[in-house]
């Protein structure tokens, strides 16, 4: 498909982090014949759904999704408050939020496989597949937690691109790990991440979609978690304002490496080396603690 595709994988379990896999994609592309076709499909899809406005978001839904409208509005409200502060933007650009009724419809529309949500910058839309509707409708904690996390992730991609338009900046100037890391961090920064990275993928191999897709299968690690931890590390070092600083400095200089150094006061290469040392040490500590736990249990 034309343009770049970004993916984020979230592993969560009610109250803890575990092995449940959830995939969400983000697309941004230039105008193309294929984009025009998708835009036409989007308008046709909207005609078949009901619509309700919430601030700058037009929510398109079928009757079966009416019970989750209040949860959706609540999540959008929280996401907007956080992202307005994060990006220093009123976030007034309109965006469509469209619920898909099943996986086949979503995959047919997006031409993407195994997804539960996506954001298209070209079409200015968020697509969501509310899984486990019965559990969502009943307010079950785990289902609600997952739904809110995915929606916040996608909304953050929308907010990021709004800011880039304000700055007249090219989204492709920012490496994929930064796009995904910011969205993952926004959706999970208030959670406690306790998972250890098996290994750290070089950032030079996480810039483009092609590299990202290759890294998914070429490394025995979680590149989505790595991107989250990279942003978390930056926020701990410099405060959450460093995210906007990097975005603005990169827009001004036209180079992510130059913008990063200006905002962080450290070269990207130096930060990467420091990050790798830290997480290699954490991995070693985790292995030692796991061995001791097993040894004690087996005594």
Regions found by a protein language model. Give the residues of each.
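A short alpha-helix capping/helix-coil boundary motif
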Residues: 7, 26-28, 59-60, 208-212, ...
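N-terminal short leaders/motifs
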Residues: 3-9, 136-137, 178-187
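Single-residue recognition of alpha-helix capping/boundary positions
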Residues: 5, 65-68, 242
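Acidic/His/Gly-enriched intrinsically disordered linker/tail segments
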Residues: 146, 150, 166-299
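Juxtacatalytic substrate-recognition/specificity segment
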Residues: 45-167, 256
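N-terminal low-structure segments adjacent to metalloprotease catalytic domains
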Residues: 1-51, 285-299
């Amino acid at each position: 498909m034309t343009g770049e595709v970004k993916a984020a994988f979230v592993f969560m379990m009610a109250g803890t982090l575990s092995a449940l896999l959830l995939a969400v994609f983000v697309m941004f592309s230039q105008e193309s014949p294929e984009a025009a076709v998708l835009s036409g499909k989007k308008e046709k899809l909207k005609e078949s759904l009901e619509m309700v406005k919430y601030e700058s978001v037009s929510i398109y839904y079928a009757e079966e999704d009416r019970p989750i409208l209040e949860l959706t509005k609540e999540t959008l409200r929280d996401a907007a408050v956080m992202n307005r502060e994060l990006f220093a933007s009123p976030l007034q650009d309109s965006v469509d939020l469209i619920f898909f009724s099943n996986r086949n419809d979503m995959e047919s529309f997006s031409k993407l496989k195994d997804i539960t949500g996506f954001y298209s910058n070209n079409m200015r839309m968020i697509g969501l597949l509310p899984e486990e509707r019965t559990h969502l409708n009943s307010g079950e904690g785990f289902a609600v937690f997952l739904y809110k996390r995915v929606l916040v992730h996608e909304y953050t991609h929308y907010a990021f691109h709004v800011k880039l338009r304000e700055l007249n900046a090219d989204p492709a100037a920012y490496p994929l790990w930064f796009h995904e890391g910011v969205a993952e961090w926004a959706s999970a920064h208030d959670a406690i991440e306790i998972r250890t990275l098996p290994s750290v993928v070089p950032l030079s191999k996480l810039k483009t979609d092609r590299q990202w897709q290759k890294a998914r299968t070429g490394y025995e690690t979680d590149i989505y978690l790595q991107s989250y931890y990279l942003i978390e590390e930056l926020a701990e070092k410099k405060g959450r304002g460093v995210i906007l600083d990097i975005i603005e400095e990169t827009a001004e200089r036209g180079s992510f490496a130059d913008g990063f150094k200006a905002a962080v006061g450290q070269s990207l290469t130096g930060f990467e080396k420091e990050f790798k040392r830290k997480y290699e040490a954490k991995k070693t500590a985790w292995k030692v603690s796991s061995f001791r736990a097993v040894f004690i249990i087996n005594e």
